[in-house]
Regions:
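An N-terminus-focused feature that recognizes amino-terminal "leader" regions
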Residues: 1-142, 148-164
Length: 166
């Protein structure tokens, strides 16, 4: 039996269930053998590089509410993915109300878990294997979650922890 959804997830008039507690996309992660060219493409599409990862060769591009991550970290999952698949989306991140619960439910339903390595001071984000060797991250920390306002205690997102502004 599924628990009732938090108010922020249950939309008026919605008749379907949301057992994973999803609440949108947090980011799409890209990898390419030539990350510079991919970044230039993002800029031509109107995205701006706004932050860099604190410890890795990873940039955050944003346009409105859309977040692209460009991962150029040598010997990372993303770069191994790019060597195998070429320029591509290597991962997506869903916003979920409770990442641990969503991960456990996905595994119970037959998904394959992915054990990544979080570095010092980084969030450990649960992930499952997606289509074509890609990853699906389950993120439960984002700004504005459950209606949080600027300055509210706990209104700290994934990007606030792992990235610093350019």
């Amino acid at each position: 039996m599924n628990a009732p959804l938090p108010q922020s997830v249950a939309r008026p008039g919605t008749t379907w269930e949301n057992p994973m507690g999803t609440d949108g996309f947090e980011f799409i992660e890209y990898a390419a053998p030539d990350p510079k060219a991919m970044g230039e493409l993002f800029e031509r599409m109107g995205f701006r590089a706004i932050a860099k990862h604190r410890h890795k060769n990873v940039l955050l591009y944003r346009q409105g509410g859309i977040n692209f991550i460009l991962n150029a970290e040598p010997d990372s999952f993303a770069q191994r993915f790019a060597r195998l698949h070429g320029p591509s989306i290597c991962a997506i991140a869903f916003r979920v109300q409770d990442a641990k619960s969503a991960y456990e439910r996905a595994i119970a339903q037959g998904a394959w878990g992915y054990a990544g390595q979080a570095g010092p001071g980084e969030l450990n984000i649960p992930a499952i294997k997606g289509i074509g060797d890609s990853l699906i991250y389950l993120v439960d920390r984002w700004r504005g979650k459950n209606g949080a306002q600027e300055g509210d205690i706990g209104n700290i997102g994934f990007f606030d922890v792992d990235f610093e502004p350019l």
